[in-house]
Amino acid sequence: MVQLQNFFFFLIFLVVLCGTAAPILFQWLVSRDVSTGAPFFNGTIIPIFTSLLLVLVYIHSRGFMRSLDEAKRIVLIRARPILLPNIIEKSSPKKIQYISFFLDEKALSIFSFFRQFFFSFFVRQFPALCFVGQYFGFVVSHKTKSGTLSDSARALGPCCCFFILLLSN
């Protein structure tokens, strides 16, 4: 599960970087407007993808966050969405009921409202990110209806990170 979250985080990071940061950086470096259309696609996007893909392969080969134990030792603060299921499973039954109610009722209703409200805007602005967002929405709704509470929390982790990333643009 940790590797899956890392993969989606880097996928979103690559898409956002290529769509927003690359034209700005090229404008600063070249001092002119750089088009991101079809004629310039290979010259603008591919070098960034290649370099970041090499970084991703290097991080994976170093064994970055392969298990929850390593995540707890290495990056405890950054791994809060990953550690949430462990916190829930060690809680008292009364606290589990409260957290379950909050995750299923409050967080999912807020997330589904924002997804429906901003969907047309995101389709126009970030079509690739919208596709990934629809996938995360399916995972969250599927996990909370049929899975356990820890599955719900695991599904909400990358979904919340993705939604915050979308709103920050």
UniProtKB/Swiss-Prot annotation:
A GO cellular component annotation in the UniProt record: mitochondrion
Gene Ontology process terms (BP): cytochrome complex assembly
Pfam families assigned: CcmF_C (PF16327)
Localization per Swiss-Prot or TrEMBL: Mitochondrion
Domain of life: Eukaryota
Keywords: Mitochondrion
Annotated transmembrane regions: none
Alphabetized InterPro entries for the sequence: CcmF_C, CCMFC
Protein name: Uncharacterized mitochondrial protein ymf3
The organism of origin for this protein: Marchantia polymorpha (Common liverwort)
Gene name of the record: YMF3
